Amino acid sequence: METPSKAPESSLMSCNEPSSCTSEQDVKSQELAKQGERLLSQLYQPLEACNNPCYCKKCCYHCQLCFLKKGLGICYERKGRRRRTPKKAKAHSSSASDKSISTRTGNSQTEKKQTKTPETALETARGLGQ
């Protein structure tokens, strides 16, 4: 009867050995997961400003920001855009929009026509004479 009692003990030992292996694997996988998280956190951190004004090859490849900005010419800074006029200013300009377009621009167009007519008359006279 001693042999059957030894068999379960050996089966328990064989079960314990793989569990220790799996626990080691779990620890390794957790460490790898932590390393992966650290790498991702470093990847998503904003790039630090590099104030080196030089555009030589060495300085262009100095860091990732320099490469993007100087080497590739990519700049992610916000460009200055037109600001919309405030609503109060629009209310004042609406009184000017009540007038028709012809009355607003009519005077300026007639002045331009008057100044151009003598010049065009001289040019046509010269063109005919030659």
UniProtKB/Swiss-Prot annotation:
Location of this chain's protein in the cell: Host nucleus, Host nucleolus
Post-translational modification comment from the UniProt entry: The phosphorylation by CDK9 does not seem to be important for transactivation function.
One Pfam family linked to the record: Tat
Span list, region Disordered: 1-28, 80-130
GO molecular function: RNA binding; RNA-binding transcription regulator activity
Residue stretches of biased makeup (Polar residues): 11-24
Motif mapping: Nuclear localization signal, and RNA-binding (TAR): 78-90
Sites bearing Phosphoserine, chain numbering: S94
Transmembrane annotation, as ranges: none
Region spans: Core: 67-77
Keywords: Activator, AIDS, Host nucleus, Host-virus interaction, Phosphoprotein, RNA-binding, Transcription, Transcription regulation
Region listing for Cysteine-rich, in residue ranges: 50-66
Superkingdom of origin: Viruses
Residue ranges with Basic residues bias: 80-91
Residue list for modification Phosphothreonine: T85
Record GO biological process: positive regulation of viral transcription
Primary location group: host cell
Composition bias, Low complexity: 92-102
Example of a GO cellular component annotation carried by this entry: host cell nucleolus
Subunit note: Interacts with host CCNT1. Associates with the P-TEFb complex composed at least of Tat, P-TEFb (CDK9 and CCNT1), TAR RNA, RNA Pol II. Interacts with CCNT2; the resulting complex is unable to bind to TAR RNA.
This protein's domain notes: The Arg-rich RNA-binding region binds the TAR RNA. This region also mediates the nuclear localization.
Reported function: Transcriptional activator that increases RNA Pol II processivity, thereby increasing the level of full-length viral transcripts. Recognizes a hairpin structure at the 5'-LTR of the nascent viral mRNAs referred to as the transactivation responsive RNA element (TAR) and recruits the cyclin T1-CDK9 complex (P-TEFb complex) that will in turn hyperphosphorylate the RNA polymerase II to allow efficient elongation. The CDK9 component of P-TEFb and other Tat-activated kinases hyperphosphorylate the C-terminus of RNA Pol II that becomes stabilized and much more processive.
Family: Belongs to the lentiviruses Tat family.
Name of the protein in its database record: Protein Tat
Gene: tat
